[in-house]
Amino acid sequence: MGPRGLQLLAVLLALGLCAPAGAQKPSACQCSRIEASHRKNCGFPGISASECFNTGCCFDSRVPNVPWCFHPLPKQESEQCVMEVAARKNCGYPGISPQECASRNCCFSDTIRNVPWCFFPILNQDCHY
């Protein structure tokens, strides 16, 4: 194999290692509920929408001077519970159990400290992407 072939092989291997296996296209709520100023880059300059989605990221080129290919918000049990941490409105009390939170028809996520773990859901109607 010549030098060009080795270069191509190296690029293909690098791209294959960067893309998560079986990456799933994020939901509309995971992409549209993140403030443009909070986007974390997930691609490279000139990435296409399909390349971006194939890595499991969101793509939106309507906002200038922010990443167009960006990491989605974390997946939740319900789309109504997908939101930025700053958007959470407390629906419980410190130490509330997931079961008690669910009995209040609220969302529960204890993965981030010092924020409400039991919080009110958001209507899916505002998911536009």
Swiss-Prot record:
The modification Pyrrolidone carboxylic acid is found at Q24. Residues 29-73, 79-122 form the P-type domain. GO terms for biological process: chemokine-mediated signaling pathway; maintenance of gastrointestinal epithelium; negative regulation of gastric acid secretion. The keyword Repeat applies. Pfam families: Trefoil. The keyword Ribosomal protein does not apply. One of its GO terms (molecular function) is CXCR4 chemokine receptor binding. SMART domains: PD. Residues 1-23 form the signal peptide. Its main location: secreted. GO terms for cellular component: extracellular space. It is found in: Secreted. Disulfide bonds join C29-C127, C31-C58, C42-C57, C52-C69, C81-C107, C91-C106, C101-C118. SUPFAM superfamilies: Trefoil (SSF57492). Keywords: Disulfide bond, Pyrrolidone carboxylic acid, Repeat, Secreted, Signal. CDD domains: Trefoil. Inhibits gastrointestinal motility and gastric acid secretion. Could function as a structural component of gastric mucus, possibly by stabilizing glycoproteins in the mucus gel through interactions with carbohydrate side chains. PANTHER family: INTESTINAL TREFOIL FACTOR-RELATED, TREFOIL FACTOR 2. This is Trefoil factor 2. It comes from Canis lupus familiaris (Dog).
